[in-house]
């Protein structure tokens, strides 16, 4: 076997081992809701939206690998919606103090108007996960 391919296979094998380690809690949990239990709302939202993104991007990859035009499928709309939630979660993380998870009121734009704060649609994230599990 070509040494270049051998090195690539070795790297792939290590990466797959890392994926298995990361996914082990999902495998051991009865449900995603059990996995989310005890986490903050922000952490739960991150978990739900990450799972939704993983499921939808896998479906997108399946379509592409089978020569199906994924742009005509609802998965594209779902991926865009999930990406919007990801950006909202990232924005929310910037506005939350990680130790207390209290909103950072030193930012004048946030303290002056609560309508500027991003809101994570917990119910929507839960529906997405229920739909895909």
UniProtKB/Swiss-Prot annotation:
One of its GO terms (biological process) is TRAMP-dependent tRNA surveillance pathway. The keyword Lipid metabolism does not apply. The keyword Ribonucleoprotein does not apply. Residues 102-116 have a biased composition (Low complexity). GO terms for molecular function: DNA binding; RNA binding. It comes from the Eukaryota. Keywords: Cytoplasm, Exosome, Nucleus, RNA-binding, rRNA processing. Residues 96-133 are annotated as: Disordered. One of its GO terms (cellular component) is nucleolus. It is found in: Cytoplasm; Nucleus. Required for exosome-dependent processing of pre-rRNA and small nucleolar RNA (snRNA) precursors. Involved in processing of 35S pre-rRNA at the A0, A1 and A2 sites. Component of the exosome multienzyme ribonuclease complex. Interacts with cut3. Belongs to the C1D family. This is Exosome complex protein C1739.07. It comes from Schizosaccharomyces pombe (strain 972 / ATCC 24843) (Fission yeast).
